Amino acid sequence: GIGAGFYLDAAQTPWRTHWRMESYLVQELLPLLAQHLPIDGERVGITGHSMGGHGALTLALRHPGRFKSLSAFAPICAPSQCPWGEKAFTGYLGADRTAWQEHDATVLMQNQPIAPYPGGILIDQGLADKFLAEQLHPHLFEAACQAIGQPLTLRRHADYDHGYYFVQTFVADHLRHHAQALL
């Protein structure tokens, strides 16, 4: 969409002054939730859908130890290699593609010295998703995980698209995945 923010802190004008989504989520929102809600701020998982799935993957990989479990639904796995990511990254980070690498889940996983989530990462992907081939690239993230020994369960579902019914169908599995890792 036109409001796609990609869960990063912008480096380009006019966005850089106020578009600080990564800082807001990690430095402000999570501590605020832990302070005001009866949750254990040390046992937090992260998940998301589509661009939110990209956010879950990149925030988890950019902030080692902050999130204890990780999952995603149809995430944008290699934004520096797809039109959505190229447009957003150019606008928020500039034309220098090296800056984009810091916000690309596939590149971030390739650069991990060891598997950051030994209990595994769960990703669900619909095979009828019209964005799969051009925008999402889960196969690239899968290869990056395999290269460093990161356990990944990438479930591919025939006849499921990119919509919320897809998420609704498998959200209980993601809740179980996080509960197992966090309890």
Name each model feature, range by range.
Residues G1-L183:
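Non-catalytic cap/lid and distal C-terminal segments of serine-dependent acyl enzymes
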